[in-house]
């Protein structure tokens, strides 16, 4: 497990160096790491989503497969995801921002590494890891938006002019839909399904005489309690991001006016 994680970590780091040197515009001086990372995240999100989806389809059938099943796709997904979070942790630590602003994302990276690392170590709960991992679909459109919003060196402006207004609006709409389906709906569904399975495994009369999951008695409190808590944390983070994305989508569609500097000064004077 560790050699594979190290391999993908160094591979991603190497690709980021190449993107920084040969693709990132020279005009970007400060946030070069972030720009290169946003480029790489588009194909990487597609890889993570497809491997997670493949594993979910294979492991969905029974209690035993959902809790004890392992596939090549589920292992690859978690390995690459851990590596990606290690790289993102380094990038976020290097970013010139107050530590207070970094804490939510650093917590996200740390909890993801620990949770998925636990799944790879025990060989259990791969389905639940991959079901959570379907949220990576949202990064396809999110990274495009972040690239377009790059203010340094007018890199974002150049991308916007190349892409065009229609595709930008379409990307924003798909981002909103993706966030709603793969985060706002997915995480509550994950929690509901998880607790139903736990109830069936430990709370039904049948479970006392015939365990639904052979070896299920070995599940630790970390797996049964901490994993749902991590998913709740992801849901709260996603909700906060969803509010911002909704406001951005409304502005893009013209339903919400963007505040000008003059309007902001007027409000300050009134206060």
What is the meaning of each model-derived region?
Residues 134-145:
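Alpha-helical transmembrane segments and their membrane-interface exit regions
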């Amino acid at each position: 497990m560790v050699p594979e994680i190290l391999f993908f970590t160094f591979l991603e780091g190497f690709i980021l160096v190449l993107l920084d040197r040969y693709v990132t515009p020279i005009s970007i001086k400060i946030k070069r790491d972030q720009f290169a990372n946003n480029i790489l995240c588009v194909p990487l999100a597609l890889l993570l989503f497809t491997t997670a989806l493949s594993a979910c389809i294979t492991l969905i059938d029974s209690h035993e497969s959902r809790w004890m099943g392992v596939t090549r796709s589920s292992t690859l997904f978690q390995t690459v995801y851990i590596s990606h979070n290690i790289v993102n942790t380094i990038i976020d630590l290097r970013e010139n921002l107050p530590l207070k602003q970094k804490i939510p994302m650093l917590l996200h990276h740390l909890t993801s590494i620990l949770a998925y690392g636990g799944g790879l170590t025990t060989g259990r709960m791969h389905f639940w890891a991959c079901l959570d991992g379907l949220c990576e679909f949202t990064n396809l459109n999110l990274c495009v938006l972040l690239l377009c919003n790059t203010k340094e060196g007018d890199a974002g402006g150049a991308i916007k002019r190349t892409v065009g207004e229609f595709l930008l609006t379409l990307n924003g709409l798909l981002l909103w839909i993706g966030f709603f389906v793969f985060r706002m709906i997915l995480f509550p569904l994950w929690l509901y399904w998880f607790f139903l399975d736990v109830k069936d495994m430990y709370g039904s009369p049948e479970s006392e005489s015939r365990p639904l999951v052979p070896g299920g008695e070995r599940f630790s409190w970390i797996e049964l309690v901490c994993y749902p808590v991590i998913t709740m944390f992801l849901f709260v983070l996603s909700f906060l991001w969803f509010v911002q994305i909704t406001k951005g989508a409304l502005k893009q569609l013209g339903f919400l006016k963007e505040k000008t500097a003059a309007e902001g000064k007027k409000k300050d004077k009134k206060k």
